């Protein structure tokens, strides 16, 4: 059987685009915590010594946007110009207006509609994906790249590698077999880590520390062999980082947020959006659907698509593809999905408890992926029992 290589990347929380995602979701959390009916579309951009939040927010919440921006930057580790941004002294610009009344009347009828009548906040199509290659039912290439990024942050914050700075990127290439449509990982072919560092550390020390404290604890030994290639800070120098190195924008890391290039993507970003925005809630419910199909044993690998029209509650279409791994025909799996899941936005909000903010609930999603996480706040990761006499776990 012929193998093939597939690559996924990740960035950690100090990457400028991810910093923006986290600020947008921290603002969403603050709004929903005080007012679960908040309508939030919050974008963030950043460059040297500046963060700007802008968008449309309609809420009864009393939110100090500047304070949230500075706290989020500080928590990530942006505490001086040396590391790429000084949370306490950077410029913070705020340009936030109310949601357009045209959108408001079309979507929620100014809160007069019942939950099942609430229309989609916009048109669009979203995809959910699941695969049996990892316990998380996520692609291994994506899981490993994401966990390497999270481990980089962990060893920076706990002092194990004091030379680390907040910005960093990871990338993992996995060798796979295609087993009748299911993906079977064989080995890790290449590991790439580029991390921001201080002036004091040598490239040899960087490579040794990354192998010992980041790669070894994350990548299972069975996937590494003498042929595995390591590119550790291959550019040779990465002192300038964060918003000083690159401009950042909310919604620029949508593949990292989802499935690492596997499955498909409708193009809509997640962060800074309340659950009437189907870019987010629609993607969450189809992940739950795909995961539940694979967990139930109906298929080894699965993608689910849903699509919407603005102001219309019922989805326009639902699609299922099991890549030939289904125990039953895809059209029967589709019927089970339609019976088991309510794709109307108002009902997704209720069933996945998406109006509950605060406590960093959505902030947590904004770094290290929205899917495959073992956390009670990630309600869409709960496997749902499927309604059908054909399901045998």
Curated annotation (Swiss-Prot):
CDD domains in UniProt: S-AdoMet_synt
Pfam families cross-referenced by the UniProt entry: S-AdoMet_synt_C (PF02773), S-AdoMet_synt_M (PF02772), S-AdoMet_synt_N (PF00438)
One Gene Ontology biological process: one-carbon metabolic process
Residues where Mg(2+) binds: 9
Free-text remark on how the cofactor is bound: Binds 2 divalent ions per subunit. The metal ions interact primarily with the substrate. Can utilize magnesium, manganese or cobalt (in vitro). Binds 1 potassium ion per subunit. The potassium ion interacts primarily with the substrate.
Subcellular locations according to the entry: Cytoplasm
Pathway note: Amino-acid biosynthesis; S-adenosyl-L-methionine biosynthesis; S-adenosyl-L-methionine from L-methionine: step 1/1
Cofactor(s) this protein cannot do without: Mn(2+); Mg(2+); Co(2+); K(+)
Reactions catalysed according to its record: L-methionine + ATP + H2O = S-adenosyl-L-methionine + phosphate + diphosphate
Listed InterPro entries: ADOMET_SYNTHASE_CS, S-AdoMet_synt_C, S-AdoMet_synt_central, S-AdoMet_synt_N, S-AdoMet_synthetase, S-AdoMet_synthetase_sfam
Positions that bind ATP: 15, 167-169, 235-238, 246, 252-253, 269, 273, 277
Tissue-wise expression: Mostly expressed in flowers, seedpods and roots, and, to a lower extent, in stems and leaves.
Segment forming the signal sequence: none
EC number: 2.5.1.6
Keywords: ATP-binding, Cobalt, Cytoplasm, Magnesium, Metal-binding, Nucleotide-binding, One-carbon metabolism, Potassium, Transferase
Keyword set includes DNA-binding: no
Record-listed K(+) binding positions: 43
Family: Belongs to the AdoMet synthase family.
Protein task: Catalyzes the formation of S-adenosylmethionine from methionine and ATP. The reaction comprises two steps that are both catalyzed by the same enzyme: formation of S-adenosylmethionine (AdoMet) and triphosphate, and subsequent hydrolysis of the triphosphate.
Subunit structure: Homotetramer.
Name used for this protein in its record: S-adenosylmethionine synthase 2
